[in-house]
Amino acid sequence: MPSTAGNDEISALVRDFAETPGHLIRRAYQAHTQLWAEVVPVDITGSQYILLCALAVHGDLDQVSVGRLTSLDRSSIAELASRMARRGLIQRRRDERDGRKRVLRITEEGARTVAAAAPYVHRLGQRLFAQFDEAERAQFLDYLGRVGDQANRG
């Protein structure tokens, strides 16, 4: 590409592509996904784990409430809930007061699954943040939470 003022400006902007937030977040997520596959022997995904945790802690929830608690979008929750219901991890039913809503409930199998996965997920977190001291880990998680909160606000 011939050097021009515009091209030089673009080159300066893209030169450090490996340091862009999206790229770094994707790499971190890739590391998490790889570690999940290595460390968590329970047949469950990260999103399924979070959904089961929400139901285990809060009891029966409609899908909108699950979305608020887990930051999962409606279509993801609907797809997850369908798969998880087929596996017997949760039950889905129509809300008695508002037939448009679907209420999710963790089953005994779901409770066993989340309990079996929890120590491995904890271990995954320890390995993922092994190079950080406790204060750095807390600060990093705070930063990630704030980025997520900002994205959710629009």
Where are the model-predicted features located?
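C-terminal regulatory/oligomerization modules of transcriptional regulators
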Residues: 1-16, 135-154
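N-terminal leader segment of winged-helix/HTH proteins
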Residues: 1-42, 106-108
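Charged, amphipathic alpha-helical coiled-coil/dimerization segments
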Residues: 4-5, 33, 60, 82-142
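Amphipathic alpha-helical recognition patches that constitute DNA-binding helices
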Residues: 16, 20, 24, 50, ...
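N-terminal helix-turn-helix DNA-binding core of bacterial DNA-binding proteins
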Residues: 23, 30-76, 87
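Conserved amphipathic alpha-helical interaction elements at protein-protein interfaces in regulatory
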Residues: 57, 91, 116, 146, ...
